[in-house]
From Swiss-Prot:
Effect of mutating residue 274 to G/M: Reduces affinity for NAD and NADP
Keywords noted in UniProt: Carbohydrate metabolism, NAD, NADP, Oxidoreductase, Xylose metabolism
Organism of derivation: Candida tenuis (Yeast)
Classification lineage: Eukaryota, Fungi, Dikarya, Ascomycota, Saccharomycotina
Effect of residue 24 to F/Y: Strongly reduced affinity for xylose. Reduces NADH-dependent enzyme activity by over 96%
Descriptive protein name: NAD(P)H-dependent D-xylose reductase
Amino acid sequence: MSASIPDIKLSSGHLMPSIGFGCWKLANATAGEQVYQAIKAGYRLFDGAEDYGNEKEVGDGVKRAIDEGLVKREEIFLTSKLWNNYHDPKNVETALNKTLADLKVDYVDLFLIHFPIAFKFVPIEEKYPPGFYCGDGNNFVYEDVPILETWKALEKLVAAGKIKSIGVSNFPGALLLDLLRGATIKPAVLQVEHHPYLQQPKLIEFAQKAGVTITAYSSFGPQSFVEMNQGRALNTPTLFAHDTIKAIAAKYNKTPAEVLLRWAAQRGIAVIPKSNLPERLVQNRSFNTFDLTKEDFEEIAKLDIGLRFNDPWDWDNIPIFV
């Protein structure tokens, strides 16, 4: 999709850029301009979600670039994610239609189940995005919807032409295995938290052997969660200042961010970093201009402590990763 960014061929047959622009926490006031500038900088994959609450603005940025002739729709790869309140098969298309309307497109390139958790349905007109709201104050209310039922609804939307590829996010290996057994269309992508503090080699090996492409979020470790004042992140040394990462970066005359992205890429993993700085956008794209050595990988492997920053156990003791 971009001459300077390698593509990954998904099991669905579609091509996905190996690096994209993450839209989590993009402010509504600036999201449209940031997406537009990222397109000008050569980015073609935009990773969003219903829950991020900024799909209208992301759509504005994409539409502006298309209207100005910078890109065609088919050159842009749009990812969105089905939020927890819409897992019931009768509500899946309702949620997707809202995403399509906000993004101002008639299909998304990739649609993921955001979490393997089903909350009570909340009508769009009542609250959107609902976040953790389940229609009962601050209480979590769950629905008994098996993942495979939600998946079958997504498969129908692929057949309808509203989605090109489908996948999952924040799934452990056992749930992914169960889904692979029952799916007619196999999940094309598994998006997970992935950084040197949480390397998940067994999950990645299993998924890749099954033909499922891995996309990493939070490639810079605690960075995004420090901005949210999360305790675990605040008490964790930043990877940008870690001696191991700094030493490798100095060896190649690269930034720590480039090293972290290249480390993931050499594991066959797509990445979706975000930056507010134009020069960083360009820097991050250069992640494929150098190679880490076996020794570099061995040093980074020593940083793995199984430290997860995005854990639904923190929400309501939801046992996805226990």
